[in-house]
């Protein structure tokens, strides 16, 4: 897109709800300058936090740096496996958000209930990811044009209009 180089790495866990998923995306003006598949420690410019527990995990927090990282965070958190075994379980979303806020500069963590937006406007929480992407794009945190991102949904070919709508609502 936009003649930029890009390297991606997707990794998925195997826990409840399919497990945590991380996607490392690195872009540059020149493909030849990209050598690593993972975002280095303290090198993330942006974290799209679609789940607060995963976003506050060691794997994700390691990538953040107070002087450079923006975080768009879905504030909704579903019960984890701990809910089944602990009758005193409390939703950790607020604690996770506080931990993330401590890792970035003031104002660089923006939290909203992306699941509520996706469910109310599109009828399905599966659209949380493009809602969070759209939110971050509207903040100016994604260095791609709207046209390029909408084209990416077309190239993906999966529920194109719904994903584009979710992005627009973000």
Report residues per predicted region:
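Active-site cofactor/cluster-binding pocket
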Residues: 1-169
């Amino acid at each position: 897109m936009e003649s930029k180089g890009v390297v991606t790495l997707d990794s998925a866990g195997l826990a409840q709800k399919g497990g945590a998923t991380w996607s490392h995306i690195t872009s540059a003006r020149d493909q030849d300058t990209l050598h690593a598949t993972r975002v280095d420690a303290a090198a993330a410019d942006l974290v799209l936090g679609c789940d607060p527990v995963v976003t506050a995990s060691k794997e994700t927090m390691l990538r953040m740096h107070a002087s450079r990282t923006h975080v768009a965070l879905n504030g909704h958190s579903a019960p984890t496996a701990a809910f089944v075994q602990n009758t005193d379980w409390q939703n950790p979303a607020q604690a996770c958000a506080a931990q993330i806020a401590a890792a970035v500069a003031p104002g660089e963590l923006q939290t909203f209930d992306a699941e509520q937006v996706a469910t109310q406007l599109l009828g399905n929480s599966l659209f949380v990811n493009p809602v969070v992407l759209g939110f971050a794009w509207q903040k100016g945190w994604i260095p791609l044009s709207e046209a390029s991102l909408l084209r990416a949904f077309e190239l993906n070919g999966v529920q194109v209009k719904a994903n584009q709508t979710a992005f627009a609502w973000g």
